[in-house]
Structures are given as structure tokens and as C-alpha cells.
Amino acid sequence: MDQIVIRGGVPLHGAIPIAGAKNACLTLMPATLLSDEPLTLTNAPRLSDIATMTALLRSLGAEVSTLQDGKVLALSSHRIDNHTAEYDIVRKMRASILVLGPMLARDGHAVVSLPGGCAIGARPVDLHLKGLEALGADLTLTDGYVHAKAPGGLKGAVFEFPFVSVGATENILMAATLAKGTTVLKNAAREPEIVDLARCLRKMGAQIEGEGTSRITVQGVDRLHGATHPVVTDRIELGTYMLAPAITGGEVELIGGRLDLVAAFAERLAAAGVDVSETAHGLTVKRANGRVGAVDVVTEPFPGFPTDLQAQMMALLCTADGVSVLEERIFENRFMHAPELIRMGARIDVHGGTATVTGVPQLKGAPVMATDLRASVSLILAALAAEGETVVSRVYHLDRGYERVEEKLSACGAQIERVKET
């Protein structure tokens, strides 16, 4: 098993290219199941989660080819000969549930195991199922599998999400494109990844209005055709690397970065004393003067502060001058990185969904263990600023969502390497 070794205290200087969004690509890939014509995705990230989704789609009968060193995905679902997404694949990744809506909409039946992924709270799929039932699906849950049927096809309906859910919005949006009549999704998620999905589906012939707002309207069509679509920039990878020069000092340009994707996050960085400016090729980030200042953070659905940047922001605030309060409103049990940061000398007090962080003058290197995807990279950020050597174990979490992180950081001067665990 791999470990990442970091020797901290080096200010970063250079440029980091930002990949296509993992969360967008994992939604776009199942969209191939809606059509019997090819779908080509460019600017795809090279991640283990993408490989998992590739394996899942192939198990259903889809063809998936990787081109240009994995940056282009060529998908074709002209023949779907298996409508069961097995537990052995689905358990590895929560996004696997996104094959349910497309298969059900196109062929009228699907069987999908309940998914896995990061161990962050309950993260139920209830809203996916309730939304599909609103479109006329007959669903039963047996032995950990969702059995879905719609022999007469799905039918448009008005469905209001009781709370905002990105995954459920994506699943039901895809299913609605082939439903008979009009579907209206109220209190829909507004994330850029949903906007990206809607744009791709529209290229495939779907009739969609309102993406990026809380009300999405879909007029169902008889069939969708093929398309070519670039995956939107990964705003979580972007935000993560924006924190690298903020926590170490120095100045880094983030190629392909877009401020509109991370506006709420950038505002909190600016409040802490970090300079963020737009360039011809992306964004430049540098720490303004001395230590960053303490700021309070509340995670919210887009366009608010992303929950997927909470752990990384905590790493920065461990080095801030003063006391910060982070309130996690999206997921329960999402402070599992705090005990590991404490091993590095951080002062963090967690009560329920709130963490109080008192900044310390200097973090210290230590052996630490990643508990989930975002926690793993928060430990790497902390290690970049720490005195001495830090060894991060269980970095397989990292490879699910970050493309060649050690290469990108070392190109900016970080002393970081991947080694085999001894």
C-alpha cells in the first residue's frame, strides 16, 4: 500500500493545471446509457473513481475507451445486455447509483446495488428513489439491491426535493429526459456539475431549462443521440490547490481555474488575508502578509461554501492567527480529519457539527492516516506547512479524487514523494 511522505516548510512557486471535475465526469459517464449513439467526453480526469465507473459501465455492456493518456473517454451504449449493477463494483463508489435513472428511462428496468464510497455519515439514496417513483417507477428493495421497473415508460411529473441533493437531482434529471411529458424539479441542486450535465444532455437532444436555478424543467423526448462534451473544471481540486500557497506562502498560478466556480470559497480566503486574482490562463493565489487570519466557515449547497473544501480549509485555519469556527451543515460525521490534524499539533475542539480551531504558530510533522478523500488531501496541505516530516497512510482515498497530486505539488517546489509502505 502506498504512503505519501512530505517534508514541510517550503513556500510553493509555479503553475498547476486543474483537471476536469471528478464529480461532473462521474455523472456524465452514465449519460451514455440514455442513447445508443457514442458519447465522447474530453478534459476527463485520470482517477481511480473514473476507472471504477468505467468498469461498471462495461459490466452493463457499454463500450468505454480511453484516449490521449486518459484525458478523452469514448463511450458507447448501443447494446446494453445486462441491467444489473453488481455489489462488487457498486460498493466502491457512491456515484454508481447514477446508472439507475438512465437504464430505467431507456429500457424500463434496472437492478442496482446500494452504493459505497467515502464513509461520511448516512448519505442515504432515499431521494433518488422517491424522485423516480414520482416519475412512475415501481421500486422494491431486496437484499441490498434496488429493483426498478417502468414497463410503460416513465412519465413526467412535478417533484420537489425536501432538501437539496446533488446526486438525486442528477439521477432524476437524466431519467426525465426520456420520460413522457413534462417534468418539473423544484428545490433542485444548483451546482456547476449539474449545469454541465444539463448542457451535455442538451447536446444529446434533451429539452431542459433552468439548470443552475432551483427549478429545472424537462420536456421528455423519444430518444437522445450522441455528442462530444468537455468536462467542466474541477472546482474542488481548484480550491484545494488554492490553499497550497495560502498555507505555505509563495505564489501559484492555477491553469484553467475559474473564479465563478469557487466564489464563496475565494471570499473566505480573501477574508483570511489570501490574495486571489484572475489571469489570462486561470487564477493566481498568494498569501498577502505573514500568517493568515482566523475566519468562520459554514458549509452550504452551491453557491455557498462547499463541504468538499471544509477539511482543506480546516488545515489552513490550524495555522491562522486567532480562533475560527467551522460549521458543517451538509454531512454528518465529517470531521474525521480533526484527530489526525491534532496529531500534528493542531488545536481543534469538535462538538457535533461544529469545530472550533485555535491557530498555532507551527504544525509539526507526524505519521497520520487518511480517513476519506478530502481528509487525505487536508493532511497533505497541513504537512506542506509543518516542520519536519509527515507520512500519510491510506492514500488510496486520495487517488479517488486527485490526479497525480505529488507531481503537481513537487513541480512547485514541494518536497513530496509517494513510497511503498514498509
UniProtKB/Swiss-Prot annotation:
The record's EC number reads 2.5.1.7
SUPFAM superfamilies registered for this protein in UniProt: EPT/RTPC-like
Pathway(s): Cell wall biogenesis; peptidoglycan biosynthesis
The annotated active site, in chain numbering, is C118
InterPro entries reported for this sequence: Enolpyruvate_Tfrase_dom, Enolpyruvate_Tfrase_sf, MurA_subfamily, RNA3'P_cycl/enolpyr_Trfase_a/b, UDP_GlcNAc_COvinyl_MurA
Q: Which UniProt keywords apply?
A: Cell cycle, Cell division, Cell shape, Cell wall biogenesis/degradation, Cytoplasm, Peptidoglycan synthesis, Pyruvate, Transferase
Question: Which residues participate in phosphoenolpyruvate binding?
Answer: K22, N23
* 2-(S-cysteinyl)pyruvic acid O-phosphothioketal modified-residue sites: C118
Record: residues binding UDP-N-acetyl-alpha-D-glucosamine: R94, R123, P124, V125, D126, L127, D308, I330
Q: Which GO terms describe its biological process?
A: cell division; cell wall organization; peptidoglycan biosynthetic process; regulation of cell shape; UDP-N-acetylgalactosamine biosynthetic process
**Care to name a GO molecular-function term for this sequence?**
UDP-N-acetylglucosamine 1-carboxyvinyltransferase activity
Q: Name one Pfam family in it.
A: EPSP_synthase
* GO cellular component, as recorded: cytoplasm
Chain's role: Cell wall formation. Adds enolpyruvyl to UDP-N-acetylglucosamine.
| PANTHER family for the chain | UDP-N-ACETYLGLUCOSAMINE 1-CARBOXYVINYLTRANSFERASE
UniProt record similarity statement: Belongs to the EPSP synthase family. MurA subfamily.
| UniProt-listed NCBIfam families | murA (TIGR01072), PRK09369.1 (NF006873)
Name of the protein this chain belongs to: UDP-N-acetylglucosamine 1-carboxyvinyltransferase
Q: Which species is this record about?
A: Dinoroseobacter shibae (strain DSM 16493 / NCIMB 14021 / DFL 12)
